[in-house]
Amino acid sequence: MAATLILEPAGRCCWDEPLRIAVRGLAPEQPVTLRTSLRDEEGALFRAHARYRADARDELDLERAPALGGSFAGLQPMGLLWALEPEKALVRLVKRDVRTPFAVELEVLDGHDTEPGRLLCLAQNKRDFLRPGVRREPVRAGPVRAALFLPPDEGPFPGIIDLFGSSRGLCEYRASLLAGHGFAVLALAYFRFEDLPEDLNDVHLEYFEEAVDFMLQHPKVKGPSIALLGFSKGGDLCLSMASFLKGITATVLINACVANTVAPLHYKDMIIPKLVDDLGKVKITKSGFLTFMDTWSNPLEEHNHQSLVPLEKAQVPFLFIVGMDDQSWKSEFYAQIASERLQAHGKERPQIICYPETGHCIDPPYFPPSRASVHAVLGEAIFYGGEPKAHSKAQVDAWQQIQTFFHKHLNGKKSVKHSKI
């Protein structure tokens, strides 16, 4: 009997869905090598491989069979996705156009030899970023430049504004995936997109206030408030939004600072200066990558007090997602500062989830962990930290934690799924 690749779900699924991979029709205990590959929209090739052995019943099921080596080892049912590595070094896998899927090619080869063995079977898995029925609406409302993702059905839906960090213009893949779980999500650009400023020299909170107003006035968004999700620089912007703006009910921060960073923040007649940084303290790793961990001064030092975001003004619960091996800045330390400041002002202690061996760029599940890549703005190779297997596990758990937190505070669901890590 010829070997056959079995995929569940068959054919296509959403990127954040697990994929069950099995091979039938092998010889008992036959050694095989499985390979995956995909190309991003710019043609960059990503590949992974792992060696396996069929069981005595002539089958191979990646949920039960450990990898014997290759891009990873051990029981890792989704390893052939998260272990994808770029053919050209320092390329990070991101989805630029969420309206099209990534096509993952899977191959089963005979044997464990370094040279590829005979091709036994192959299959393709198309991984979508828009679940069936999810709608994408470009937003050009006054100065606001964004993309709104709406779940199927009539709504209205609980609303979220999603902000990325300082390396991209409009980044939509996290928002599009989150909309598939019942949220109306606005992926918001704030520089380097269309007619927005090219550089982050000054940031005006009024722009983000208009985005909040847009969401609250949208007929498909359930008021009277929305939530915020921010990563890196987007995280301290979300802290400022939660502290100064009305209509915010919950905030999730992924590896964020408690001080305003990168550029001065303006709001009405107030200016919050940026946290002092010293680029002379940039370090170079043994691999030649830059790490910015030591460039940021301590926000608690007296000369930095004015840069601290007054998060004690916020009337919302916070969830801090922390990579304990974040090499961009001291995310765990910043989360501790936030907790102490909130409690010192009689506020609710924030939920903090710390993930060991996890770096800066915590993406939705099954994205290959980005330990180092060329920063889109700086044009330099930056080291972000993280151990691939642990980081990948953290991404799966964090994605569920984020959804649980938002469902609880936007929909009033009280069941909380505790972290497995």
Curated annotation (Swiss-Prot):
Enzymatic reactions: pristanoyl-CoA + H2O = 2,6,10,14-tetramethylpentadecanoate + CoA + H(+); phytanoyl-CoA + H2O = 3,7,11,15-tetramethylhexadecanoate + CoA + H(+)
UniProt entry tagged with the keyword Hydrolase: yes
Family in the record: Belongs to the C/M/P thioester hydrolase family.
Enzyme Commission number: 3.1.2.-
Function: Catalyzes the hydrolysis of acyl-CoAs into free fatty acids and coenzyme A (CoASH), regulating their respective intracellular levels. Catalyzes the hydrolysis of phytanoyl-CoA and pristanoyl-CoA, two methyl-branched fatty acids derived from phytol, that enter the body via the diet.
Gene Ontology MF: a single term: fatty acyl-CoA hydrolase activity
One Gene Ontology biological process: acyl-CoA metabolic process
Record's GO cellular component terms: cytosol; peroxisome
UniProt keyword Amino-acid biosynthesis, yes or no: no
Involved pathway(s): Lipid metabolism; fatty acid metabolism
Record's protein name: Acyl-coenzyme A thioesterase 6
Motif (Peroxisome targeting signal): 419-421
UniProt-listed InterPro entries: AB_hydrolase_fold, Acyl-CoA_thioEstase_long-chain, BAAT_C, Thio_Ohase/aa_AcTrfase, Thio_Ohase/BAAT_N
Active site (record annotation): S232 (charge relay system), D326 (charge relay system), H360 (charge relay system)
Pfam families: BAAT_C, Bile_Hydr_Trans
Superkingdom of the source species: Eukaryota
Keywords on record: Cytoplasm, Hydrolase, Peroxisome, Serine esterase
